[in-house]
Amino acid sequence: MLDTQSIIQAMAPELWLAASGLMLVLVGAIVGERFNSLSYKVGALVMFGAAALSAMHLQGGEAFNGLVKTTTFTNFTKVISFTLAGVAIFLSEGFLRRHEISRYEYPLLMVLASLGMGIILSANNLMTLYMGIETLSLSSYVLAAFHRDSARSSEAGLKYFVLGALASGILLYGASLVYGFTGTTSFDGLTLAGESVGAMFGMVLMIVGLAFKISAAPMHVWTPDVYEGAPTPVVAFFASAPKFASLVVFANVMFTLFGSVMDQWQLIVAIIAGLSMIVGSLGGLTQNNIKRLLAYSSIANVGYALVAVAAGQVLGAPALLTFSTIYVISSLGLFAGVLAMRRRGGMVENIQELGGLARRQPVFAIAMTVLVLSVAGLPPFGGFFGKYEVLRAGVEAELVPLAIILVIASVVSLGYYLRLLKVMWFDEPKETFERVDVTVLGTVVACAVIAGVVFMIFIGELGTGGWASYAASGLLP
C-alpha cells in the first residue's frame, strides 16, 4: 500500500513539476499562441515553486519501496538547480521573441528537463536513475535544436542526440552488467553486494556514461559544438542547472553505490579529473568564440569538481557542493551577460567584439569582471574559496599529483580569462553596444553579487564548516 505522506516527503517537487508540465501542455493546446508570452512567466514560477518544495522537505525521505530516496545532499541540490532553471526560463523570452521562435513548448521542455533532474537526484535504483537521465536528455536534445531555422542549432541538436544516445547505451550496458553480477538494481542492495570483476567492469562503463553527461574529458567532444550552436539561453540552462545536478548525481553514485569499492574507482575518476583540467585549460586558449571558450572553461571546472569526488565522501562532498554552487551561479551570470550583449541587432559572439564594453556600459562590465574572476578562482572572489576547498580536499586525501595539476591548470586558464578582461577594459570600441535589457542586467549583477561578494564575505558560515557540511551529511550512514 502506498504511503501518501512518504511520497510527498520524498517527491513533492517532482510531483509538482509533472502536474505543471501536463497543465502547460493542456493550456498551450487549448489557448494556442496567445499563451506563448505568459508561458515563460508561468514556467519560471513553476520552477521557483519546485525549489520551495525542495526546501520545505529538505530532510528528504523514501518512497515506492526504495525506488526513490532523497537526503539533504540531493534536496539542497534541487533547491539550487530548480532556482537556476527558473532564472534561465525568465531570461529566455526576449531572445526567443527576437528570433521569432518564442513558443510555449520552450518553458514546457525546461520543466520536463527539470523533472528529469529531480528524478536522477531522487533515484535509489538503477532503473529510476536511467529513467531520469533519459527524461532530462530527451528534453535537452530538443532544446539544443529549438532554433530550427539555424543550421548551427540543428547541427548542435543532432550531435548532442547521437553522442548522447551512445553514452546512454554505454551507461545502460554498464548498469545491466552491475545487475547481472550482483542480482539487484537497488542502491542499498548494491552497497552491500560483494565485489566481482563483472560488476567492476559495469561500474567503469557507468562512469564513462555519466562522464559524458557532465562533459568530462575525454567524453567532452560534444560540449564546444553544442555550446556554440545551441541558442544562448539554452546554453545558459545547460551550463547551470543540469550541470550542477549531474555533478551531484555522479558523486552520489560514486559515494553510495560504489562507496565500498572506492579503491577500484578512485584512480579512474582522478584520471578523468586530470584530463578534464588539462583539456579545459589548454583548449580555451585558442578560442575566439565566447561560447566555445566558456565551454572549455566548463570542462576545466568539471575537472576541478571531480577532484573533490576522487577525494572521497567525507572530504569531497562538502567541497563539491561549495565549489559547484559558486561555479554554476557564476556560469549562469556569464551566459546571461553573453545573452545581453548585442550589436547591430545581432549577438556578440567573438571576443574581439567585447572591445570598449567598460567605457560604454561600466556597470555591466564590472559585473562581468566579477563573474569572470570568480570562475577563474582568483581571490578575494567566491570562486577562489570554492576552488580552495577542492584543493584542500585533494591534498588531505593524498591526491597530491592531482592537486598540482589543479593549480597548474588554474594558472594556465587565466590566459583566456584575463584575455576577456583585457578586451573589455582596454581595447578600443569598434561599434556601439545596444542597450542592455534591464531584466538581464539585473540577473548578471545579482549573480555577480552572490558569487563574487556574498560568498567572499560569508564563506566562514557558507563553506564546508556550515551549510555544505550539513547538506553533505545526508550521505553519511
Swiss-Prot record:
Keywords attached to this entry: Cell inner membrane, Cell membrane, Membrane, NAD, Quinone, Translocase, Transmembrane, Transmembrane helix, Transport, Ubiquinone
Cellular component terms per the entry's GO annotation: plasma membrane
EC number in record: 7.1.1.-
GO molecular function: NADH dehydrogenase (ubiquinone) activity; NADH:ubiquinone reductase (non-electrogenic) activity; quinone binding
Reaction catalyzed: a quinone + NADH + 5 H(+)(in) = a quinol + NAD(+) + 4 H(+)(out)
InterPro entries, A to Z: NADH-Q_OxRdtase_suN/2 (IPR010096), ND/Mrp_TM (IPR001750)
Transmembrane region(s): 11-31, 38-58, 76-96, 107-127, 161-181, 192-212, 235-255, 265-285, 298-318, 319-339, 364-384, 398-418, 440-460
Main location: membrane
Keyword Protease applies: no
GO biological process, one term: ATP synthesis coupled electron transport
Cellular compartment(s): Cell inner membrane
Keyword Transmembrane: yes
Sections of the chain in a coiled coil: none
Membrane topology qualifier: Multi-pass membrane protein
Cited Pfam families: Proton_antipo_M
Function description: NDH-1 shuttles electrons from NADH, via FMN and iron-sulfur (Fe-S) centers, to quinones in the respiratory chain. The immediate electron acceptor for the enzyme in this species is believed to be ubiquinone. Couples the redox reaction to proton translocation (for every two electrons transferred, four hydrogen ions are translocated across the cytoplasmic membrane), and thus conserves the redox energy in a proton gradient.
Family according to the record: Belongs to the complex I subunit 2 family.
NCBIfam families referenced in this protein's UniProt entry, alphabetically: NDH_I_N, PRK05777.1-3
Subunit structure: NDH-1 is composed of 14 different subunits. Subunits NuoA, H, J, K, L, M, N constitute the membrane sector of the complex.
Annotated protein name in UniProt: NADH-quinone oxidoreductase subunit N
Species the sequence originates in: Hyphomonas neptunium (strain ATCC 15444)
